[in-house]
């Protein structure tokens, strides 16, 4: 039979308790079912056969109750009741389940439930709040990011310098008043361009008309207008033709002599000694030029 006074005298005063922690001023209890965390007679979960406490598991609160009737069954020693997430309903559940428990235990259970609810709300707020997260980076990635930042900074400085320089040039009229170009001067330039294009078109039309007028007209040209260089070219061409004819005649005569020698050899006659004499063909070319005085007709 269980006796709470005997257990407390044994654990609390004389012998050793594995859940007890002593300090200079006070003793604490490390048992997971401890209601207040203090080591005293009313808060000890081992020395009280009728006991209750509140525990939190994965964001959900549970009410644990112990009675003396289940002391002989350690497997069924604690009864667990799930509490509502609504604070008022949870307090009502505590009152309903702890009707026959001491008032001290009922009050401490409500106090413990209130503290657990407060830190759960605090946890939810912190999770929803934006927080800094430290991410470890390798040295290689860190160097790469640093180089990229330096290049981006240089590019930004260069763009700013270019923009500043362009603004200064614009203020100093370096580009010759590009944006404030006078309209009358622009119109004058357009008129000059149109006049030049019209004059060029008229000249082309006049040339075309002259060409059309010259069609069908006859002109007589004097014989003396032929250049001497053209005549010399014609003479050179005639000489080339004559030399080619001579070569062809010489080749034909040599072929005939060779054929005669071969035929004589077949007939049993001795071939002629010595080199064969080739005959050269002489060609005489005469040029006749007739000059007649012709009056040149000039048209106006």
From Swiss-Prot:
Residue numbers carrying Phosphoserine: 197, 200, 229, 232
Gene Ontology MF term list: RNA binding
A UniProt-annotated Pfam family: Mak16
Tagged with keyword Nucleotide-binding: no
Keyword Cell division set for record: no
Main location: nucleus
Compositionally biased region (Basic residues): 263-278
InterPro entries registered for this protein in UniProt: Mak16, Ribosomal_eL28/Mak16
Signal sequence, renumbered to the chain: none
Record keywords, A-Z: Acetylation, Isopeptide bond, Nucleus, Phosphoprotein, Ubl conjugation
UniProt-listed GO biological process terms: maturation of 5.8S rRNA; maturation of LSU-rRNA
Gene3D superfamilies according to UniProt: 3.30.390.110
Biased composition (Acidic residues): 193-214, 222-236
Modification N-acetylmethionine occurs at: 1
Cross-link (Glycyl lysine isopeptide (Lys-Gly) (interchain with G-Cter in SUMO2)): 55, 151
GO cellular component annotations of the record: intracellular membrane-bounded organelle; nucleolus; preribosome, large subunit precursor
Region of interest: Disordered: 191-278
Subcellular location: Nucleus, Nucleolus
Family indicated by similarity: Belongs to the MAK16 family.
Protein name per UniProt: Protein MAK16 homolog
């Amino acid at each position: 039979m269980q006796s709470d006074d005997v257990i407390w005298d044994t654990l609390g005063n004389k012998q050793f308790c594995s859940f007890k922690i002593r300090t200079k001023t006070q003793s604490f209890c490390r048992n997971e079912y401890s209601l207040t965390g203090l080591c005293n007679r009313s808060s000890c979960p081992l020395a009280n056969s009728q006991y209750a406490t509140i525990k939190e598991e994965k964001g959900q609160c549970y009410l644990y109750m112990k009675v003396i009737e289940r002391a002989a069954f350690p497997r069924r020693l604690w009864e667990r009741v799930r509490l509502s997430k609504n604070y008022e309903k949870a307090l009502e559940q505590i009152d309903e389940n702890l009707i026959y428990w001491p008032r001290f235990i009922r009050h401490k259970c409500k106090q413990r439930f209130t503290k657990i609810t407060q830190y759960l709300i605090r946890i939810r707020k912190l999770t929803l709040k934006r927080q800094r997260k430290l991410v470890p980076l390798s040295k290689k990635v860190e160097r790469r990011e640093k180089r990229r930042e330096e290049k981006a900074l240089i590019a930004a400085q260069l763009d700013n310098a270019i923009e500043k320089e362009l603004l200064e040039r614009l203020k100093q009229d370096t580009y010759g008043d590009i944006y404030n170009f006078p309209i009358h001067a622009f119109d004058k330039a357009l008129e000059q361009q149109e006049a030049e294009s019209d004059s060029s078109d008229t000249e082309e039309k006049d040339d075309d008309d002259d060409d059309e007028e010259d069609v069908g007209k006859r002109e007589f040209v004097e014989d003396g207008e032929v250049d001497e260089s053209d005549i010399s070219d014609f003479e050179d061409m005639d000489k080339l033709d004559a030399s080619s004819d001579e070569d062809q005649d010489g080749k034909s005569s040599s072929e005939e002599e060779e054929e005669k020698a071969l035929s004589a050899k077949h007939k049993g006659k001795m071939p002629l000694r010595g080199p064969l004499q080739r005959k050269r063909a002489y060609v005489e070319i005469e040029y006749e030029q007739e000059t007649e005085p012709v009056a040149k007709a000039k048209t106006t």
